[in-house]
């Protein structure tokens, strides 16, 4: 409750392509399957969220040492930095869930986000 600024990256959950948690071996195949079944599309500080930016209730939730999801949401200035077009959907979902206040991206990702905005 005393945190006023957060700076983080954002994880994109497309396990067969980009999930660094999967490629690094941090998550087992059964855990990746569970995340997919729960509709996870991204994570902030290893707190997983769905397409609406709502926290997903997974078996990993209670085993993760990170700020609680509701505490993170209360931070007044949540800054997220990202690069790579594969992060676009996770960013849109996080914005929908009010998980990002300030966004820093590369030019290709910025263009992808603009293109997504035009189709909605």
Regions found by a protein language model. Name each.
Residues 1-120:
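Conserved phosphate- and dinucleotide-binding cores of soluble alpha/beta proteins
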């Amino acid at each position: 409750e005393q945190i006023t600024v957060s700076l983080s990256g954002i994880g994109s959950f497309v396990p067969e392509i980009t999930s660094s948690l999967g490629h690094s071996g941090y998550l087992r195949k059964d855990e990746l399957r569970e995340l997919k079944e729960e509709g996870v599309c991204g994570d902030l500080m290893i707190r997983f969220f769905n397409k609406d930016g709502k926290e997903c209730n997974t078996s990993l939730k209670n085993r993760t040492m990170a700020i609680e999801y509701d505490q993170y949401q209360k931070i007044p200035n949540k800054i997220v930095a990202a690069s790579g077009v594969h992060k676009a959907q996770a960013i849109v979902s996080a914005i929908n869930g009010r998980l990002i206040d300030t966004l820093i991206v590369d030019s290709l990702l910025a263009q992808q986000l603009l293109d997504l905005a035009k189709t909605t």
